[in-house]
Amino acid sequence: MSDTLDLAVELIRRESVTPEDAGCMDLVIERLAPHGFQAEWLNFGDTKNLWLRRGEAAPLFVFLGHTDVVPPGPLEDWSSPPFAPEIREGRLYGRGAADMKGSIAAMTTALQRFVVHHPGHPGSLAVLLTSDEEGSAYDGVVKVVDVLKSRDTVIDWCLVGEPSSFARLGDVIRVGRRGSLGGVLRILGVQGHVAYPDKADNPIHRFAPALHELTTEIWDGGNEFFPPTSFQVSNIRAGTGADNVIPGKLEVLFNFRFSTELTVEAIQRRVETILDRHGLHYELSWRLSGLPFLTRETELVSATRAAIAAVTGLQPRADTGGGTSDGRFIAPTGAQVVELGPLNGSIHKIDEHVAVEDLEALSAIYERILGNLLAVL
């Protein structure tokens, strides 16, 4: 069993359902501390955050990952227990295999080899791991970034191990992500008996025309890097459960995934304009999960492309799709951010898995990225 596969198996055995780490970070420390990496815990609340750094000089390269995983769901639906990793037909099965314990294993072994081959490398290397990515993300990377800023720590390059690949390892790299803006809207009406609508004010009926306008609005046309901004309603709640009561309040949860063509303020203003135009009595609160970011054709992107081509022969496609990642907290610092990891077809699903051969290939790609950036300086 290779070092990368061995570590991936050990990580998957830890039942680190968010926000638990379950000892995963200790496994990484055990492997990197002997190579000169200094470990520092930056924990907040129930979240464990680990900052491992080797060297103090610039430039600083950071591998970013998360040890927490989503719940496995019904255990009886799995072909093998989700936290008892099993290899079948060349695939490693287990919760977190692709998202993202396989990547963490590949990062770790890549760093081990790189430091052995280049003990006097220029710059510094670091690993940032959190146990709060799949959950609220309140006490994870966002808090660590604040600590690093207070120390004037500058991250030059950040490679996130999120599963970016689609059909083959390395066919897609993420060079950005859309922003995520959520809202909770409460339409206020007057409760009453369904037989006496003249004595009530139905918030569902009131909101229907506005909902139609919100869902058909063209928010922007996107650009060469991002698809058009999307608006989606995720939940609608109203009523008492009885069929003879007009509700007095309607609650709507919605989300925007937005491009660099729009600002948060512009979205908020347009939503409120639509609601006001329909004469609604409402309360509205917002939650910004992350701003859109984009890393153009910079050193990190070039180094990543070259490494993928050398190991797999592929020319990766740059993409900004998918959900949010912790890269959204690093990008505003000015760092170049790229996401590269295993195939994402099984993530968050029953029988999550990663190809065993992809683990070693990913580790080789990560090592080449380090060499492309640091070994030749």
Swiss-Prot record:
Q: Which InterPro entries match?
A: ArgE/DapE_CS, Bact_exopeptidase_dim_dom, DapE_proteobac, Peptidase_M20, Peptidase_M20_dimer, Peptidase_M20A
Q: Which residues bind Zn(2+) 1?
A: 66, 99, 162
| Gene3D superfamilies (UniProt xref) | Zn peptidases
Instruction: Write down the PANTHER family for this protein, in alphabetical order.
Output: ACETYLORNITHINE DEACETYLASE, N-ACETYL-L-CITRULLINE DEACETYLASE
What Pfam families would the database entry show? M20_dimer, Peptidase_M20
Q: Which GO terms describe its biological process?
A: diaminopimelate biosynthetic process; L-arginine biosynthetic process; lysine biosynthetic process via diaminopimelate
| EC annotation from Swiss-Prot or TrEMBL | 3.5.1.18
Q: By its UniProt entry, which SUPFAM superfamilies does this protein fall under?
A: Bacterial exopeptidase dimerisation domain, Zn-dependent exopeptidases
Spell out the NCBIfam families in the cross-references.
dapE_proteo, PRK13009.1
Q: Which residues form a coiled coil?
A: none
Q: Which residues form the active site?
A: 68, 133
Q: In which pathway does it act?
A: Amino-acid biosynthesis; L-lysine biosynthesis via DAP pathway; LL-2,6-diaminopimelate from (S)-tetrahydrodipicolinate (succinylase route): step 3/3
Q: Would the keyword Hydrolase turn up in this protein's UniProt record?
A: yes
Q: Which cofactor does it need?
A: Zn(2+); Co(2+)
| Catalyzed reactions | N-succinyl-(2S,6S)-2,6-diaminopimelate + H2O = (2S,6S)-2,6-diaminopimelate + succinate
Subunit architecture: Homodimer.
- Enzyme's top EC category: hydrolase
Similarity field: Belongs to the peptidase M20A family. DapE subfamily.
Q: Which residues of the sequence carry a binding annotation for Zn(2+) 2? A: 99, 134, 348
Q: Which UniProt key words apply to this protein?
A: Amino-acid biosynthesis, Cobalt, Diaminopimelate biosynthesis, Hydrolase, Lysine biosynthesis, Metal-binding, Zinc
Q: What is this protein called?
A: Succinyl-diaminopimelate desuccinylase
Task: Extract the CDD domains matched here.
Answer: M20_DapE_proteobac (cd03891)
GO terms assigned for molecular function: acetylornithine deacetylase activity; cobalt ion binding; succinyl-diaminopimelate desuccinylase activity; zinc ion binding
